[in-house]
């Protein structure tokens, strides 16, 4: 696992809290109706006034500002006179939300709300996380990324290009918040199961960090979404006049690695060694390589490899406890051999070793099927990760035949790789 998970390095400690515990942020405001008498006035320690308040999503409360706050902040008359509590504003948003016919329209409503009233946005999300998570993140965020240029309203996050090498520290200094605790970064090359979306991949870091706040209580002003734009190999996007990223083929090799090296060091220099850097949706060729390169140097992890694996293996171990069974008694077949599958497989090997199973024997309990069939020794074009799980067996083309021959006790179909027709 990465430094954030495997070596004990965690987020920076806070006074009066255990090491790594972030203060829980809450968007909740007092519940008062339009004609309710607001509570006693409190000093408003802000330097911003007037439109700078109402147009700042971190400060804006919509019509929940009391009369005293409106007078102190110089916004009296800039918003309608009625006082609407956050509860009432939530009701209004929900009524409008439910009228939308498509999930993409619902996504746009929520993102627009996030851009103007952050407190209300997270109040909406936390009112029913199960309902809104599929809209803010998968699966709807994939559709939103595909239409990112068309639905683009306001920039959110930091856009770094391959041409910015040598200036990343300056760019990070342009970000208005200094106390960043979590960074989610992607280069847009493998967005969910949709392929190379280039700059449009920014929807992934934005959506993931919204869950950091809604589900984990991390202050949104301590979160930074980042898109590393090194070009795209998506010809459709390169021809699209609405595409807002770099319009050239992806840069690979030393120039790409130099950008990543500078980025990792610049983030650590700016925000500290305990700032968590989460990698999202990098292509397989880079994901494992960069994880192995940075995991013991920086506070980072790859969610597609390690995050998915930790949840999947935790579920397996929990099931074993219920059935009073041992992991070593099982044989696993994977449908798919991408980042998620490999991450789960590697963690299963670690769990088997913890039971006393030698590594060589542990790998023999894991059979992997990719788009070309069973991964076996001697098959051409196997990368390093696949070679580890290549079995000494004749080639088999279908999952059905693999199941018949191997007789597994468990079949695992990771997200984005599971072909349901195979089952």
Residue ranges and their predicted role:
Residues 339:
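Acidic/histidine-rich catalytic neighborhood
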Residues 1-21:
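N-terminal chloroplast transit peptides
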Residues 2-8, 25-328, 334, 342-352, ...:
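Metallocofactor- and cofactor-centric catalytic cores in central/energy metabolism, strongly enriched
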């Amino acid at each position: 696992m990465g430094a954030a998970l495997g070596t004990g390095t965690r987020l920076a400690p806070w006074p009066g809290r255990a090491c790594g515990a972030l203060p829980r942020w809450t968007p909740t405001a007092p519940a008062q109706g339009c004609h309710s008498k607001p509570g006693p006035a409190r000093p408003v320690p802000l330097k911003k006034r007037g439109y700078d308040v109402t147009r700042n999503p971190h400060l804006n409360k919509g019509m929940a500002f009391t009369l005293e706050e409106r007078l102190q902040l110089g916004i009296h008359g800039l918003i309608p006179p009625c006082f609407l509590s956050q509860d009432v504003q939530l009701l209004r948003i929900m009524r409008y939300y439910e009228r939308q016919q498509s999930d993409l329209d619902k996504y746009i409503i929520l993102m627009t709300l996030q851009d103007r009233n952050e407190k209300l946005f997270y109040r909406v999300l936390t009112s029913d996380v199960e309902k809104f998570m599929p809209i803010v993140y998968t699966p709807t965020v994939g559709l939103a990324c595909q239409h990112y240029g068309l639905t683009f309203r306001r920039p959110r996050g930091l856009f770094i290009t391959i041409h910015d090498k040598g200036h990343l520290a300056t760019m990070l200094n342009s970000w208005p918040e200094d106390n960043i605790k979590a960074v989610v970064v992607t280069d847009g090359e493998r967005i969910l199961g949709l392929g190379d979306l280039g700059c449009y991949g920014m929807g992934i870091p934005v959506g993931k960090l919204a869950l950091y706040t809604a589900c984990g209580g991390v202050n949104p002003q301590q979160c930074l979404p980042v898109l590393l734009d090194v070009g795209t190999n998506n010809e459709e996007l390169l021809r699209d006049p609405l595409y807002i990223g770099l319009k050239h083929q992806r840069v690979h090799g030393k120039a790409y690695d130099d950008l990543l090296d500078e980025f990792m060091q610049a983030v650590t220099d700016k925000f500290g060694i305990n700032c968590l850097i989460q990698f999202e949706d990098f292509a397989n060729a880079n994901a494992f390589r960069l994880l192995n390169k940075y995991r013991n140097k920086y506070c980072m992890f790859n969610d597609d490899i390690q995050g998915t694996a930790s949840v999947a293996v935790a579920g397996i171990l929990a099931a074993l406890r219920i059935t009073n069974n041992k992991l070593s008694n099982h044989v696993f077949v994977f449908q798919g051999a991408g980042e998620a599958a490999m991450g789960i497989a590697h963690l299963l090997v670690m769990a088997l070793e913890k039971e006393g199973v030698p590594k060589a024997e542990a790998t023999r309990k894991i059979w992997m099927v990719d788009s070309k069939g069973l991964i076996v020794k001697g098959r051409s074009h196997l990368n390093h990760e696949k070679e580890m799980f290549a079995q000494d067996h004749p080639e088999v083309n279908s999952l059905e035949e693999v199941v018949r021959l191997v007789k597994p006790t468990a079949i695992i179909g990771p997200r984005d790789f599971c072909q349901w027709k195979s089952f």
